[in-house]
Amino acid sequence: MAELYYQGHGSFRITSDGGRVMYVDPFMGDGYEPEADLVLITDEHYDHNDLTKITAAVGCKVFRGRDMTDGKHYGSGEKDGFRFRAVPAYNRNHKKSECVGFIVEVDGVKIYAAGDTSTTDYMPLLAGENIDYALLPTDGIFNMDAEEASACAAVIKARHSIPIHTKPDTPFDGTVAARFHAPGKLVVRPGEKIKL
């Protein structure tokens, strides 16, 4: 069974049942000791792309949002049992051509890492994806706030929705997370793990 470890802010790690390790948006917190087989970076803002945190395993691959889209077309890939594809993520602070979300599948579980985004035209299509875990930003400064994220969660219809990116340069703000409402809501605090 795959496992998610939340480092804080927008940073998290997923370890497959076979022990392969993927990091998304490395920046905040600890828990970077396991060598990375795969790293996904949703955008190039400093709080999403600190590769100095990562020790790369032999053959590690890094996929950056800017390389996964031109704003119209979106790439996909597969590495060590992780299947992933980029999807639109954008708002007034993030251009369509520079930022993406990722849908990741591993061990029969589907995860949506929204990246820095607000509501997108693509989100209604996510309802048909049967997403198990949606990780949604909620800070309301560089992306949508908790109320808008709650509305997006209702559209996406993931089995579980997790509020992240709750406050700039802060691992986690429980007050913001408490304002996020969604069926199957999970609150995961920095340093906590969940079985997927």
Label the predicted regions:
Residues 32-34, 52-59, 127-130, 152-157:
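Short, conserved loop/helix-junction motifs that constitute active-site signature segments
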Residues 36-47:
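Metallo-beta-lactamase
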Residues 50-59, 171-179:
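Metal-dependent catalytic neighborhoods of phosphoester/phosphodiester hydrolases
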Residues 20, 56-62, 156-160, 183:
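A short helix->loop->beta-strand "cap" motif at the edges of active sites that frequently abuts
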Residues 14, 43, 84, 116, ...:
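Divalent metal-coordination and catalytic microenvironments
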Residues 41, 59-67, 160-165:
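Short internal beta-strands
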Residues 1-34, 38, 65-128, 144, ...:
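Core dinuclear metal-dependent hydrolase active-site scaffold
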Residues 120-196:
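Cap/insert and terminal regions of metallo-dependent hydrolase folds
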